[in-house]
Amino acid sequence: FYGVRGSISVSGSRYTEFGGNTTCFRIMAVDSGRIGIVDAGTGIRQLGEDFLEELQEQSEMFIAFSHFHWDHIQGFPFFAPAYNKNLQINLLAKGGSKKIKDLKDIFATQMQETYFPVAMDNMGARFNFLLLDKNSQIFTPPDGIPVKITAMEHIHPGGAYSYRYERGGYAIVFATDIEHGETIKEDVVELAKNADILVHDGQYSKEERVH
């Protein structure tokens, strides 16, 4: 867990238990050491530093996005591996009722000269922009072990998606920035069924939500 905060990053001794970075998760395949990433909040900066320090021999990686609010993309320009010309980065999202027509534009816009000194096209890495057109899709990375990715839309202002990743008989589910309302959405329950790990948002207690 490289970032679990919402909205904005924070610093200070009072935040040491959970850290101060915004959303970013790393998934690592223990057999091959290959990594995948979910969301690119400020936590992705440290993830990138660790990736380089560990000298991982990986020429391709996936970064999946639950949605594109600032706290899920604001670390992307500071992801050091993205400046490696020998790396291919697949940026993945699910299209939906508000279908993203140009996934590249989301990242290129926040790196325009007005906002950031380096344009996306000058970062170095090769970028591949993938929009899931189905709820489930299977990808086969260079290690030859298929990864099934299932996306399920859940309640959040502007829309967001929970993801289920299945590989080698194991499953992990990420359901972040999720709001159930009075009842839990059955689709999300089904998505999480029999998962080995469920990562679920718990930003507000009932008492906090009142305020």
What feature does the model see in each segment?
Residues 171, 179-211:
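Cap/insert and terminal regions of metallo-dependent hydrolase folds
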Residues 1-173:
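Binuclear metal-dependent hydrolase catalytic cores
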